[in-house]
Amino acid sequence: LLRIAATLLPQNDPDFDLKSGPVAYWWLELDGIEGRREIGFDDRGDIVRFAPIGANRGVFVGEELAPHHLNESLTSQEFEQAWERALAGWRR
């Protein structure tokens, strides 16, 4: 299963796969059970990928793939601040 996921990720996030390290945790913006936006952080808390942007579809965006065992909630303001930080650092 992990090998399958590893082969799918490059198709979903072509701009990030060669440039970023592994994702330790995700922040997901959900519309019901469907992923709307996602931000992936490394183990230091740095943003290593986010979607959707450009050719990067993401892992959870537009799919009913959001994990059923979500942990803590965050405010929309916290998510938006992280999203803006990701956009500010976005380089193609």
Specify the residue positions occupied by each region the protein language model found.
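Generic preference for hydrophobic/aromatic residues in regular secondary structure cores
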Residues: 1-5, 28, 35, 71-73
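Negatively charged, low-complexity tracts enriched in Asp/Glu with abundant Ser/Thr
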Residues: 1-25
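Generic low-complexity, intrinsically disordered sequence content enriched
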Residues: 5-6, 13, 34, 69, ...
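Residue-level detector of functional hotspots within protein domains
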Residues: 14-16, 25-27, 45, 60, ...
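Broad hydrophobic/π-residue packing in well-ordered secondary structure
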Residues: 24, 30, 79-83
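Compositionally biased, intrinsically disordered low-complexity regions enriched for acidic
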Residues: 29-59
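Short, compact, well-ordered microdomains
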Residues: 51-92
